[in-house]
Swiss-Prot record:
The gene is kdpC. Keywords: ATP-binding, Cell inner membrane, Cell membrane, Ion transport, Membrane, Nucleotide-binding, Potassium, Potassium transport, Transmembrane, Transmembrane helix, Transport. InterPro entries: KdpC (IPR003820). It is found in: Cell inner membrane. Part of the high-affinity ATP-driven potassium transport (or Kdp) system, which catalyzes the hydrolysis of ATP coupled with the electrogenic transport of potassium into the cytoplasm. This subunit acts as a catalytic chaperone that increases the ATP-binding affinity of the ATP-hydrolyzing subunit KdpB by the formation of a transient KdpB/KdpC/ATP ternary complex. Coiled coil: none annotated. It comes from Shigella flexneri serotype 5b (strain 8401). This is Potassium-transporting ATPase KdpC subunit. The system is composed of three essential subunits: KdpA, KdpB and KdpC. Belongs to the KdpC family.
Length: 190
């Protein structure tokens, strides 16, 4: 019985620290230092939430830039089912999926002159990626220009405006957020 009291008091102390103090402290610091990120990096138009800057959306129309394929099968870009496809590079099923995606992209983008960018046919590790390279966005310009009756120049400028450079110049590559880019594309029509 004498060993029960120190064990119980240690348990209660650690429960208070790890279950109360630490979560409250990290939440408060997150809200203070990074309020936008701590609240989900939500993209708002007025009072309406249009998406998150961290999670891709399933844009499928010809008038939109398409992002990386989602690995969340039943409902694309479902954050509750996040995860990669887990198919190895040597798996024939992955080859079939990529071939089908290439064929679909070629059919939807007949005016594209170069090879299909790799990130448009391969899912990210999370299956929710919202970024593609500016080159992958530019590859889609002819389709979008035709669907929205916009000039190639307008779309090129839009991609340049929404492209983000890596934090460190030689580590990483420039990316463009598909959700933000497509929302800006919708504003061009207004």
């Amino acid at each position: 019985m004498s060993g029960l009291r120190p064990a119980l008091s240690t348990f209660l102390f650690l429960l208070l620290i790890t279950g109360g103090v630490y979560p409250l402290l990290t939440t408060a610091l997150g809200q203070w230092w990074y309020p936008w990120q701590a609240n989900g990096s939500l993209i708002r138009e007025g009072d309406t939430v249009r998406g998150s800057a961290l999670i891709g959306q399933n844009f499928t129309g010809n008038g939109y830039f398409h992002g990386r394929p989602s690995a969340t099968a039943e409902m694309p870009y479902n954050p509750q089912a996040s995860g990669g496809s887990n198919l190895a590079v040597s798996n024939p099923e992955l080859d079939k999926q990529i071939a089908a995606r290439v064929a679909a992209l070629r059919a939807a983008n007949p005016d594209a002159s170069t090879n299909v960018p790799v990130e448009l046919v391969t899912a990210s590790a999370s299956g929710l990626d919202n970024n593609i390279t500016p080159q992958a966005a530019a590859w889609q310009i002819p389709r979008i220009a035709k669907a929205r009756n916009l000039s190639v120049e307008q779309l090129t400028q839009l991609i340049a405006k929404y492209s983000q450079q890596p934090l460190v110049k030689y580590i990483g590559q420039p990316v463009v957020n598909i959700v933000e880019l497509n929302l800006a594309l919708d504003k061009l029509d207004e």
